[in-house]
């Protein structure tokens, strides 16, 4: 009730703001196009900060509203203006399907773009980024802003007038798409001023990535914004960076991007050298293990736990004495992965096999995710299980979660149709409140209580009866399923019954638009996985409203109430009639794993007979509580990931800041002086600080430097300070000699070398961190807090890495010889071969990256492109 009252208070405040905007808008109505453009230029001079933007919100929103009316023939409703205010304030605006989020976003985008630091509109796919930029582009161009679009595969565009001369003429002669004298709320296409529609057409012109980011507004996907950030921190020249900072972003489908994908890091990776035979061997070994005897399955945590018998069996089969010995831990992870592939990951539910490839199915949308792979060798384990070619594992060069990427923005906002159920997570993780924006027309959809059966067989029989009944009266039905397997099972039952229908799942996603367009027509039956939720608009055909509108039938409850609400949201849009009902059984995954006992007791108390469903508000409430419990578990997992990644994020920023310092530095003398000082002082302090000097150990610790650099056998030192000064001066003299030898190219050569050293150490560090994550999860079974353990280990590891970076730089700047332009070009090409992966990531069930750990050279470097270093 308190939250509800708070939402009411916010809306009351917004309503007052809207009335002020309406007053200004009525004054603008009589002004010429050229005057509106002049007012926009004046505003741009006034708005230089978020505080200025707050002050000029009323004029800016009114200007956008009038510009949209004239260029698009669309006037944002008052509720859309409210949504825009919420977005400007850095909140999540919950706006139902069909309520016009795209248009609502133009107002805060314009206002914040006036500041001149760039605004990012984040969408979930390339098509939507292009579509929305083109659709809303005329508004921004009319008001003097530039609009860019970034797409995958390096494609970038600017939105420009299709016919600049005609657009100029339309502005000068005061043309408007909205005809004079039309006073309705919604302008239909046939009533629009055709001449103005033609004049305000826009198109995409290809530009560079950097130019797209220099536009006032940049549309793109969450993946591309994140990948560009990571790529920017791998460049060898500062001018190759494309982003210009993280100022203000609006995330469309915010719940999907910021919550559902929060466990899914963006990863830039390259190939590893793992042998496919290892995965095939363990796929065969896994078949010999008996469930509940050799191992147990934790379905809630999606992991496998070996019993003592299982451990003994594994040691015997693999031929090792102790499976948990540090040298064998990679074998343990291979076995766990193979068992997971066999018992936890199901074909046509979690993945499909197409053209000899294992392709992941998105658990939230049901869409196929080609290119995305499970990490840590799990994908290879599934490939081995299915007998398809095994693709090589990868090495991580750079990674970031969406949680940490989007928290870099000075101001972040989101919009979606379903957010209120996740408000606590939005607040805790991103500091964003959720504001529920009212619909323009009242919602009249009927949401029935759940029907619960004892078995899935009974449930499906009743679902088919319900579909048949509604089909016969001509009412369209959309049936939501949770997997491809279940959508095809239901389809086969309907075929036997002779009920015509269409199927929409990941296997038929190419036909999505066509299938969705028909879903609201009279007599149409559509079976869909969750993919029918996002970015689709189901319009009712003639006569359907009189039959009760589109009927949604849910065949199972999802772990998240939000996904169920998205399915319901397919009907009843913009005041249309509609209804929804969920058919459940005690054998459904959610109820079986988390609540069958409680619901079974209720059914026994009420003496429900076999085949007889129960439908009661109390039961619906009980199921909702089960979902809340599961949401809590999933939030806890995401929170654990975030706490771990927060540690990594501080370290990532430190490394990237060091890279920037090197990229921007005009002269490296001071920087290298600090490094030499660090190398010398740490060793003198360790081996020669007291009375007991250990010169032999000191010599060994400095043995990575060029031979003959130090003469510690002949010299006598009266104090550790004298020893320190001698060592430091020798390093400095040798560096100055090397600098002289390289000549004018020294800065370029040293910069190139230092960046490659940092990148190589950071890459290896990320790999080690993955191993630590896996190890601390195992320790959590021993009652140790995995977060505390992770922090302790990674803080030490990071300090060690920074020490190794300093040692390696100090060593290699004294050994380096001049690098040719050809060498540098080849190194850049090597960098270009890295892969971009939006990798499926599950904190609870990570697995090792290698079957056997190869001994690494102490402080050695794997590769620096073609740079040559004297040994």
Swiss-Prot record:
InterPro entries per the UniProt record, alphabetical: Helicase_ATP-bd, Helicase_C-like, P-loop_NTPase, SecA, SecA_CS, SecA_DEAD, SecA_motor_DEAD, SecA_preprotein_X-link_dom
Gene Ontology biological-process entries: intracellular protein transmembrane transport; protein import; protein targeting; protein transport by the Sec complex
E.C. number(s) listed in UniProt: 7.4.2.8
SMART domains: SecA_DEAD, SecA_PP_bind
Residues binding ATP: 80, 98-102, 537
Record field: catalytic activity: ATP + H2O + cellular proteinSide 1 = ADP + phosphate + cellular proteinSide 2
GO cellular component, one term: cell envelope Sec protein transport complex
Presence of the UniProt keyword Membrane in the record: yes
Keywords: ATP-binding, Cell inner membrane, Cell membrane, Cytoplasm, Membrane, Nucleotide-binding, Protein transport, Translocase, Translocation, Transport
PROSITE patterns: SECA (PS01312), SECA_MOTOR_DEAD (PS51196)
PANTHER family for this protein: CHLOROPLAST PROTEIN-TRANSPORTING ATPASE (PTHR30612:SF0), SECA INNER MEMBRANE COMPONENT OF SEC PROTEIN SECRETION SYSTEM (PTHR30612)
Record's subunit section: Monomer and homodimer. Part of the essential Sec protein translocation apparatus which comprises SecA, SecYEG and auxiliary proteins SecDF. Other proteins may also be involved.
Similarity field: Belongs to the SecA family.
Name of the protein in question: Protein translocase subunit SecA
Species of provenance: Thermotoga sp. (strain RQ2)
Name of the coding gene: secA
């Amino acid at each position: 009730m308190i939250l509800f009252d708070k939402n009411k208070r916010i809306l009351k405040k917004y309503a007052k703001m809207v009335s002020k905007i309406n007053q200004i808008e009525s004054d603008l109505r009589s002004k010429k196009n050229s005057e509106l453009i002049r007012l926009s230029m004046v505003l741009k001079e006034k708005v230089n900060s978020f505080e200025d933007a707050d002050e000029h919100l009323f004029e800016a929103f009114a200007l956008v509203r009038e510009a949209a009316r004239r260029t698009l023939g669309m006037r944002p409703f008052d509720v859309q203006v409210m949504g825009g205010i919420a977005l400007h304030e850095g909140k999540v605006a919950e706006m139902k399907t069909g309520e016009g989020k795209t248009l609502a976003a133009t107002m805060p985008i314009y206002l914040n773009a006036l500041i001149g630091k760039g605004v990012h509109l984040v969408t979930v796919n390339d098509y939507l980024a292009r579509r929305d930029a083109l659709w809303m582009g005329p508004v921004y161009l009319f008001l003097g802003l530039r609009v860019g679009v970034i797409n995958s595969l390096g494609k970038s565009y600017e939105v420009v007038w299709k016919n600049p001369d005609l657009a100029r003429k339309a502005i000068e002669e005061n043309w408007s798409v909205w005809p004079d004298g039309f006073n309705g709320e919604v302008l239909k296409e046939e009533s629009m001023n055709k001449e103005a529609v033609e004049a305000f057409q826009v198109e995409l012109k290809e530009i560079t990535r950097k130019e797209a980011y220099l536009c006032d507004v940049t549309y793109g996907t969450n993946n591309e914004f994140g990948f560009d950030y990571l790529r920017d921190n791998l460049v060898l020249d500062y001018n190759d960076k494309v982003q210009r900072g993280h100022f203000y972003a609006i995330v469309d489908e915010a719940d999907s991007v910021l919550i559902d994908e929060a466990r899914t890091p963006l990863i830039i990776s390259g190939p590893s050298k793992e042998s496919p035979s290892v995965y095939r061997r363990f796929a065969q070994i896994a078949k010999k293990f008996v469930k509940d005897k050799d191992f147990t399955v934790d379905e809630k945590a999606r992991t496998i736990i070996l019993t003592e018998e299982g451990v003994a069996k594994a040691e015997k089969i693999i031929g090792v004495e102790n499976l948990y010995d540090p040298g064998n831990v990679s074998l343990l992870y291979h076995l766990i992965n193979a068992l997971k592939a066999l018992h936890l990951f199901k074909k046509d539910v979690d993945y499909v096999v197409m053209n000899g490839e294992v392709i992941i199915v998105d658990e939230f949308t049901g869409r196929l995710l080609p290119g995305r792979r499970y990490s840590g060798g799990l994908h290879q384990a599934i490939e081995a299980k299915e007998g398809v070619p095994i693709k090589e594992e990868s090495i991580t060069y750079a990674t970031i979660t969406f949680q940490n990427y989007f928290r870099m923005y000075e101001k972040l906002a989101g919009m979606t149709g379903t957010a209120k159920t996740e408000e606590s997570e939005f607040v805790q993780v991103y500091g964003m409140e959720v504001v529920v924006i009212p619909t323009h027309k009242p919602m009249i959809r009927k949401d029935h209580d759940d029907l619960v059966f004892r078995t899935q067989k009974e449930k499906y029989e009743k679902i088919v009866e319900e579909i048949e009944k509604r089909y016969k009266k001509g009412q369209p039905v959309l049936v939501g399923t949770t997997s491809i397997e279940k959508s095809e099972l239901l389809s086969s039952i309907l075929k036997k019954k002779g009920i015509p229908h269409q199927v929409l799942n990941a296997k038929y996603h190419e036909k999505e638009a066509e299938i969705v367009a028909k879903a609201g027509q009279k007599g149409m039956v559509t079976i869909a996985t969750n993919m029918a939720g996002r970015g689709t608009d189901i319009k009712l055909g003639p006569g359907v409203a009189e039959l009760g509108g589109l009927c949604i039938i849910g065949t199972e409850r999802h772990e998240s109430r939000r996904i169920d609400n998205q399915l319901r949201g397919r009907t009843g849009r913009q005041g249309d009639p509609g209804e929804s009902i969920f058919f459940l059984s005690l054998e459904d995954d959610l109820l079986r794993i988390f609540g069958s006992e409680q619901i079974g007791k209720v059914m026994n108390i009420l003496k429900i007979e076999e085949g007889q469903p129960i439908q009661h508000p109390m039961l619906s409430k009980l199921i909702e509580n089960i979902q809340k419990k599961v949401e809590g578990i999933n939030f806890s997992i995401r929170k654990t990931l975030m706490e771990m990644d927060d540690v990594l994020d501080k370290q990532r920023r430190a490394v990237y800041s060091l890279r920037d310092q090197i990229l921007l530095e005009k002269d490296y003398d001071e920087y290298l002086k600090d490094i030499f000082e660090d190398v010398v002082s740490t060793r003198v302090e360790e081996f020669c600080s007291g009375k007991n000097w250990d010169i032999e150990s000191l010599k060994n610790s400095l043995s990575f430097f060029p031979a003959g650099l130090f003469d510690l056998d002949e010299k006598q030192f009266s104090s550790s300070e004298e020893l320190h000064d001698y060592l430091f001066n020798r390093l400095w003299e040798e560096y100055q000699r090397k600098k002289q030898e390289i000549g004018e190219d020294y800065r370029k050569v040293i910069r190139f070398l230092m960046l490659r050293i940092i990148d190589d150490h950071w890459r290896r560090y990320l790999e080690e961190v993955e191993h630590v994550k896996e190890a601390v999860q195992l320790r959590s079974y021993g009652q140790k807090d995995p977060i505390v353990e992770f922090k302790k280990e990674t803080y030490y590891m990071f300090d060690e890495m920074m020490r190794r970076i300093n040692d390696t730089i100090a060593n290699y700047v004294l050994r380096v010889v001049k690098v040719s332009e050809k060498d540098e070009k080849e190194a850049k090409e090597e960098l270009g071969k890295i892969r971009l992966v939006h990798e499926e990531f599950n904190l609870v069930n990570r697995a090792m990256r290698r079957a056997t750990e190869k001994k690494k050279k102490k402080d050695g470097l794997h590769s620096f492109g073609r740079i040559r270093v004297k040994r």
